[in-house]
């Protein structure tokens, strides 16, 4: 099966191309921290030769608790993103939660993300599609891998075929997520070769059954990322923080920022090896 290529400026995202890193921080905590984290990512990815797109949310609209930090909001968030682009020349991905956000966000960033909890909302899909932007679709935790083809078709019917699909784990009973490694191939087939990326960070979440915030298993980041890349995918989606225990959202799943370079060096070596192999067609 021919693998589709989605272009983000000069970055080619495809399952048979060198992996692209979609990474940054969970939510914009401050302008200064965003600058610090983005600068580190750019430095490391430039050194290792890894295509890079900075990720952060300007509004975490789906927090469990009404008391949890959501972010700086649309206006301030776009100002920070524009400064990051102007300063570092970086591509940016962020999520939108309402139809009204789609165009203003697409005017600034390079990729707009459809959140997992909203992936079947047709009005939101239509609004995002009409921007013409590259779209990253988070596969819902409650959706089987084969069903992602319906979402891709919905975007295509709305006039946008620049679709990336993102695996972020599946519900396993209450409060736990697992990643089905067979699902990556199913998603490729169901979407007719769309690029698949792997959100390692959020796949490591493990909720406290009675708490308001997610726990996590960041100590297993490396093994999970290696397993995903071994299936031959287009990219990784990672969140890091200089002090994960002080992060304002999903710290327990975040990669410590000082581990980024050794982590990515291993991931690049593995990806290069996997993609050096010829395909074996088994019917």
UniProtKB/Swiss-Prot annotation:
Its EC number is 2.5.1.55. The keyword Disulfide bond does not apply. SUPFAM superfamilies: Aldolase (SSF51569). It catalyses: D-arabinose 5-phosphate + phosphoenolpyruvate + H2O = 3-deoxy-alpha-D-manno-2-octulosonate-8-phosphate + phosphate. InterPro entries: Aldolase_TIM (IPR013785), DAHP1/KDSA (IPR006218), KDO8P_synthase (IPR006269). Pathway: Carbohydrate biosynthesis; 3-deoxy-D-manno-octulosonate biosynthesis; 3-deoxy-D-manno-octulosonate from D-ribulose 5-phosphate: step 2/3; Bacterial outer membrane biogenesis; lipopolysaccharide biosynthesis. Its main location: cytoplasm. One of its GO terms (cellular component) is cytoplasm. One of its GO terms (molecular function) is 3-deoxy-8-phosphooctulonate synthase activity. GO terms for biological process: keto-3-deoxy-D-manno-octulosonic acid biosynthetic process. It holds the Pfam family DAHP_synth_1. It is found in: Cytoplasm. Keywords: Cytoplasm, Lipopolysaccharide biosynthesis, Transferase. Belongs to the KdsA family. This is 2-dehydro-3-deoxyphosphooctonate aldolase.
């Amino acid at each position: 099966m021919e693998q589709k290529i989605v272009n983000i400026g000069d970055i080619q995202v495809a399952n048979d191309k060198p992996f692209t890193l979609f990474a940054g921080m969970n939510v914009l905590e401050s302008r200064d921290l965003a600058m610090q984290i983005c600068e580190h990512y750019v430095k490391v990815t430039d050194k290792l030769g890894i295509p890079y797109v900075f990720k952060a949310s300007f509004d975490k609209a789906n927090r469990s608790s009404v008391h949890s930090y959501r972010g700086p909001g649309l206006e301030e968030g776009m100002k920070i993103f524009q400064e990051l682009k102007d300063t570092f020349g970086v591509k940016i991905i962020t999520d939108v939660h309402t139809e009204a956000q789609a165009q203003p966000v697409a005017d600034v960033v390079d990729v707009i993300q459809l959140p997992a909890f909203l992936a079947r909302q047709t009005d939101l899909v239509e609004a995002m599609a009409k921007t013409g932007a590259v779209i990253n679709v988070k596969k819902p935790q409650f959706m089987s891998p084969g069903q992602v083809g319906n979402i891709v078709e919905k975007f295509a019917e709305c006039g946008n075929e620049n679709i990336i699909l993102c695996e972020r784990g599946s519900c396993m009973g209450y409060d736990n997520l697992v990643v089905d490694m067979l699902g990556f191939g199913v998603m490729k087939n169901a979407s007719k070769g769309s690029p698949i990326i792997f959100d390692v960070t959020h796949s490591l979440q493990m909720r406290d059954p009675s708490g308001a915030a997610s726990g996590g298993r960041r100590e297993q980041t490396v093994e999970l990322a290696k397993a995903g890349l071994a299936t031959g995918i287009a990219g990784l989606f990672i969140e890091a923080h200089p002090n994960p225990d002080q992060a304002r959202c999903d710290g327990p799943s975040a990669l410590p920022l000082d581990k980024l370079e050794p982590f990515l060096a291993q991931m690049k070596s593995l990806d290069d090896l996997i993609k050096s192999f010829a395909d074996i067609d088994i019917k």
